[in-house]
């Protein structure tokens, strides 16, 4: 082996022994060393004086690491304490405690403020620098951990231990994914391939092994060397692996596994090395000294020059191959390398939904050999593009079209650095691995091209390099500095997004996003939620304050909630310009405040007082009660009849109005033919009166009178239907229908009454205030219906299926309590097998367009009242959010018992999971539990999504803390953490008992509930 490596410098680094060192991979110009003198020293390669010494440890430093920007420094000590320094501020910013023995390995997460540490206590811990605590603990090694490496996408972390085992951990699922046990010595170094789905492991057993991360199989191993492996790293182009041994440097190709070159370096203990600008830079240590070693990669195979004799031999031997390639290149389609797919940058760490990597091979051009510095620049640019991609997205890759040189990026934003993927979802696109024959063929082709250029008189002294033939000219001309600045800008964005500073304008406007509307089969009710969607373009820079539509809502709603007379309200509406608005919107501390209401609610929340969301509704109730003073008993004559009255308490869910079915042998007499509906503020459908066989009807007085008081909803009157063998002896057969003001439709549920009496029994249904819309349902008939009435202009046929005739406990629970006269017997009719199918009711007396418009406008005030209530609650939460009081916002959310508002806020928090702490998790558990009991689908889905992410982040911490033995002594922080974890654990156990019920609902809820149940069952 030729002497192609040399020592650049050597200097004394510490007053005691040097235990560890690390080179910054961004610039390859900074060096960290840790020693027995409890210090971490920063060095600039090429200089012998330390510009900075970091103090704070009280025991020897065993491990050090830079972050990707070389701004933060991490150091683990023999006591198990980990300290974090900021080089720009020259101070220690964090200290982490948790390991029971020396911290032997530390590593920064590639994105976000996370880090991992391994210790001799066999535990691997993942820490969050903002939460100042451990968020995940992995146990499985039987001896200490010696090295740690994150996957390029940050979703996996790999640990190598003194037990000769390499373990792959899935950060998203929080569990062991796979382990490799083929080494016979302690693991000393790990590295991921920059382009392929491949892992290399170096061990003290003097071998390097290559593992396929798609199948988790061993695909190759090197022959045992004379000495053990100290450090390994892939070349940025991915073709070769550089392996630092105890006594020298080896260069391996990984497919096939061949030793391409070797250099005797003469170092003592290699600590770390890097490859930058065509140079190999290694750092070794011995006692208290550090040595810097350099080797020129252009002089190493397969990147170095081949001898002249070997060139000529290759030209003669493969001249036929050259002629064939020239003939193929002159044809209509140029020759394409069979291994072009291995040269493309592939998105190898993406979700299942983002596998649209462009693979258009096109024609590939062979470029002239470039200087080693330019080669490294292009390769580094390629690698950075694969990891970061354009526009600042974390997880994206760029595939290059060889024909046009265009780039297409495929990226997906992540809520946390390692989320949104299940266990084992790291994927790799199909690629072509080169066999030995293909590798030799590509090498021979490169030699033939070089010889051809030499014969033509080209003044090129450097020998060709195989990888240059696959780099596009556009990529070669792109400066590295521009790419480096893009990467720096991307990283700065991530740091700002994950920092603990007060929320930015984007965070302040997080609640201005249009709520997600889930359309279920209950569309009549869900259609009213459409108006909540807001066009983001209508919001200005100031958020809600600059939106004219939002400002108009409180003013209109204030008129609804006011106690003014209807005449006054009409006067106010005569001024559409807003000059006569009663209570304009005011802006107080960035929050829209309606005078006299919103601000008082916010102040009450700050004082901790209890508030209610029914204040506005009570005003409307009082106004409606004043408008309706009619006694329902006035509709019946003083002739001794006993009215049947159905009453119901106020409720917030849609009501079901019960149609009355009068069966056989029922005699109803009346002198007054019109069937009228009394005047009222709002009403529900008049229940259809169905007179069955053998019924004698004479209009002596109203047969059915329905009076409904104090309502904010209204519905249309349903027809009166007469069945077979019905004798109608009436001089006036018309039915007068009086339509009153109404706001929403109601739902009809059938009640079948069998009456065998001739008493005059008017049936009166009295129902109190209803605050939510309902749905009209078709009525039910007992037998086939023949319309034989002169009132056919309002008649319709209603048919139902047999199953709709069954009375279930749910239906009975929703029906109002009825008190019937002793002469009236209530009976539930059995289902008939020969019932006709369900059919939509056809009402012939349709309203004209003006009536429809009027009816729609009558529901407008109720809709605005609902929106105003939700807006007020969201403003309360936003009031805390703008003060960076996330905990206070969650506390306010618990008091606001509005599931729609809770679902909206939690859906935003799901996208910002990094701001939540374990304490906030304990406060969110009751809210999430209540959302799981919602009858609508969206709150349940939002709750399950949040629980899946929270359990993935905090589940391991909660389980380990609750199951850990009690610590002897007084530790206030430990006791507080234990109490919080116990609260979270109890809440999760309660949720786990609810999941089997949710799993039976079907659809997306079932899948998420089953997934959460499996996660909670893990030990």
Swiss-Prot record:
A motif (DWD box) lies at residues 114-130. Keywords: Cytoplasm, Cytoskeleton, Microtubule, Repeat, WD repeat. Transmembrane segments: none annotated. Residues 553-572 have a biased composition (Basic and acidic residues). The keyword Secreted does not apply. May participate in a complex which severs microtubules in an ATP-dependent manner. Microtubule severing may promote rapid reorganization of cellular microtubule arrays. Confers precision to microtubule (MT) severing by specific targeting of KTN1 to MT cleavage sites such as crossover or branching nucleation sites. Together with other KTN80s, regulates cell elongation by modulating MT organization. This is Katanin p80 WD40 repeat-containing subunit B1 homolog KTN80.1. It comes from Arabidopsis thaliana.
């Amino acid at each position: 082996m030729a002497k192609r490596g040399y020592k650049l410098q050597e200097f004394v680094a510490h007053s005691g022994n040097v235990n560890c060192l690390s080179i910054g991979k961004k610039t390859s110009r900074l060096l960290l060393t840790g020693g027995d003198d409890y210090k971490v020293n920063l060095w600039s390669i090429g200089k012998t004086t330390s510009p900075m010494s970091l103090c704070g440890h009280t025991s020897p430093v065993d491990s050090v690491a830079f972050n990707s920007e070389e701004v933060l420094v991490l150091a683990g000590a023999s006591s198990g304490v980990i300290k974090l320094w900021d080089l720009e501020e020259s101070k220690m910013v964090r200290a982490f405690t948790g390991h029971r023995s020396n911290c032997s390995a530390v590593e920064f997460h590639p994105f976000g403020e996370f880090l991992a540490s391994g210790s001799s206590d066999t535990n691997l811990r993942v820490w969050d620098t903002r939460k100042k605590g451990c968020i995940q603990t992995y146990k499985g090694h039987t001896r200490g951990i010696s090295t740690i490496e994150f996957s390029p996408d940050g979703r996996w972390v790999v640990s190598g231990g003194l037990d000769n085992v390499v373990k792959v951990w899935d950060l998203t699922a929080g569990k062991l994914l796979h382990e490799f046990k083929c080494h016979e010595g302690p693991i000393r170094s790990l590295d991921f391939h920059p382009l392929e789905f491949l892992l290399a492991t170096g061990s003290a057993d003097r071998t390097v092994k290559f593992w396929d991360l798609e199948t988790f199989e061993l695909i190759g191993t090197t022959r045992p060397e004379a000495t053990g492996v100290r450090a390994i790293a892939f070349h940025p182009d991915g073709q070769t692996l550089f392996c630092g041994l105890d006594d020298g440097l080896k260069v391996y190709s990984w497919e096939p596994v061949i030793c391409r070159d070797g250099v005797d370096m003469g170092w003592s203990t290699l600590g770390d090395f890097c490859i930058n600008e065509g140079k190999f830079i290694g750092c070794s240590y011995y006692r208290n000294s550090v040595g810097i070693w350099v080797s020129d990669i252009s002089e190493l195979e397969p990147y170095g020059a081949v001898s002249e004799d070997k060139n000529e031999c290759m030209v003669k031997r493969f001249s036929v191959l050259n002629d064939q390639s020239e003939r193929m290149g002159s044809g209509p389609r140029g020759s394409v390398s069979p291994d072009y797919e291995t040269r493309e940058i592939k998105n190898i760490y993406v979700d299942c939904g983002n596998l649209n990597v462009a693979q258009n091979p096109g024609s590939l051009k062979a470029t002239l050999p470039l200087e080693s510095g330019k080669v490294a620049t292009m390769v580094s640019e390629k690698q950075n593009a694969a990891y970061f991609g354009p526009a600042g997205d974390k997880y994206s890759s760029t595939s290059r079209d060889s024909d046009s040189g265009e780039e297409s990026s495929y990226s997906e934003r992540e809520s946390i650095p390692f989320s949104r993927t299940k266990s084992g979802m790291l994927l790799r696109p199909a690629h072509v691995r080169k066999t030995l024959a293909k590798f030799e063929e590509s090498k021979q082709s490169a030699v033939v091209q070089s010889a051809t250029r030499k014969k033509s008189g080209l003044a090129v002294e450097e020998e060709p390099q195989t990888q240059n033939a696959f780099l596009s000219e556009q990529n070669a001309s792109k400066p590295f500095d521009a790419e480096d600045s893009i990467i720096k800008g991307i990283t700065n964005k991530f740091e700002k997004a994950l920092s603990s500073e007060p929320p930015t304008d984007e965070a302040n406007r997080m609640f201005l996003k249009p709520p997600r509307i889930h359309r279920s089969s209950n569309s009549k009710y869900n259609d009213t939620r459409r108006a909540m969607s807001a066009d983001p373009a209508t919001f200005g820079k100031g958020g809600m304050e600059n939106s004219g539509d939002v400002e108009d809502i409180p003013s209109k709603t204030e008129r609804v909630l006011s106690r003014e007379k209807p005449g006054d309200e009409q006067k106010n509406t005569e001024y559409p310009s807003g000059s006569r608005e009663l209570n304009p919107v005011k802006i107080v501390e960035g929050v829209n405040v309606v005078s006299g209401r919103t601000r008082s609610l916010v102040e009450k929340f700050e004082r901790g007082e209890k508030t209610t969301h029914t204040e506005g509704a009570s005003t409307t109730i009082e106004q409606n009660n004043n408008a309706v003073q009619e006694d329902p008993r006035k509709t019946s004559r003083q002739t001794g009849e006993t009215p049947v009255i159905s009453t119901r308490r106020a409720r917030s869910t849609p009501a079901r109005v019960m149609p009355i079915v009068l069966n056989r042998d029922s005699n109803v007499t009346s002198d007054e033919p019109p069937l009228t509906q009394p005047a009222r503020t709002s009403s529900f459908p008049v229940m259809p009166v169905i007179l069955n066989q053998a019924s004698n009807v004479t209009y002596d007085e109203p047969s059915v009178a329905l009076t409904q008081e104090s309502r904010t909803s209204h519905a249309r009157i349903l027809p009166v239907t007469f069945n077979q063998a019905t004798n109608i002896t009436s001089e006036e057969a018309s039915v007068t229908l009086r339509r009153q003001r109404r706001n929403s439709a109601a739902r009809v549920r059938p009640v079948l009454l069998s009456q065998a009496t001739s008493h005059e029994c008017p049936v009166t249904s009295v129902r109190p205030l209803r605050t939510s819309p309902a749905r009209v349902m078709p009525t039910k008939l007992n037998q086939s219906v023949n319309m034989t009435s002169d009132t056919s202009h309002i008649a319709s046929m209603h048919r139902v299926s047999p199953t709709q005739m069954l009375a279930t406990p749910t239906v009975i629970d929703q029906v109002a309590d009825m008190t019937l006269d002793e002469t009236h017997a209530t009976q539930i009719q059995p289902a008939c097998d020969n019932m006709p199918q369900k059919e939509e009711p056809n009402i012939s007396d349709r309203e004209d367009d003006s009536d429809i418009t009027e009816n729609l406008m009558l529901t407008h005030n109720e809709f605005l009242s609902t929106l105003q209530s939700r807006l007020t609650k969201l403003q309360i939460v936003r009031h805390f959010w703008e003060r960076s009081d996330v905990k206070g916002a969650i506390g306010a959310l618990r008091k606001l018992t509005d599931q729609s508002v809770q679902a909206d806020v939690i859906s935003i928090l799901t996208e910002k999971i990094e701001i939540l702490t374990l304490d906030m998790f304990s406060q969110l558990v009751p809210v999430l539990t209540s959302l799981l009991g919602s009858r609508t689908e969206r709150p349940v889905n939002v709750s399950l999504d949040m629980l899946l992410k929270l359990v993935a982040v905090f589940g391991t911490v909660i389980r380990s803390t609750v199951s850990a033995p009690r610590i002897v002594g007084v530790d206030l922080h430990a006791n507080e953490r234990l109490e919080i974890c116990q609260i979270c654990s109890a809440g999760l156990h309660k949720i786990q008992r609810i999941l089997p019920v949710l799993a039976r609902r079907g659809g997306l809820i079932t899948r998420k509930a089953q997934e959460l149940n499996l996660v909670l069952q893990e030990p």
